[in-house]
Amino acid sequence: MPASTLLLPLQLFLAAGWMRAGIEKVIEPDWWSGTALEAFLSAQDGQMLPLFVPFVDYVVAPWTVGVAWFVMIAQLAVAVCLGLGRFLRPALWTGVLLNVTFVMSGRVDPSAFYLVMEMALLFALARPTSRRFAMRRATLWSLAAAPFVPFVTTLHPAEVIHDPAMMMITLCWIAAITTIVRSIDRERLGPLAVPLWQAPTDAAEPPPVPHGRGQTFDRGAQRY
């Protein structure tokens, strides 16, 4: 069974989740005025990752109305694209951008789980790569986790799920490991590692078949 079919429940779940979040904001007047976003930022004060605070202060806070509109439209657009199965890569990367923003602002749940599902779909859509290229990507994912290490506040099993820095590190590690494993599967399976929806559909033209003395039969033209 193609991976696209096996992962369809994740795609539909994400579509429903983003649609719910978008509609929730559309019917809330305070989101249109930016007041709800200002209240959200105030509530998250002290919980944001320190490296994210300058972005909020100098980019989000002065443009709360525009950012609020962007979030509403982006959430609805992601939901529609995932629900219809169109523009999946742009939709998933937009979802990743939104969820990473929410996690770095201190709101880990449910964004961390959305990120895992979005990454699973993106890896399913990606073409297999060589092990050397996969190692480079895995290294980049590992380096992306490094800036969050100083901001880990707890390793307690009951609290670590609420630590935005630890969640970002975990997601980067998951991406790095998955990248390497996919490259190993490609080398082990060869052509079978290519998803069915990415396999070439145009078969090679068969060579002419000899037909009689000094003549050939052209299969494409159906003539002698």
Question: Across the structure, where does each feature detected by a protein language model lie?
Answer:
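Extended, low-polarity transmembrane helix blocks
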Residues: M1-L51, Y58-A74, L84-Y224
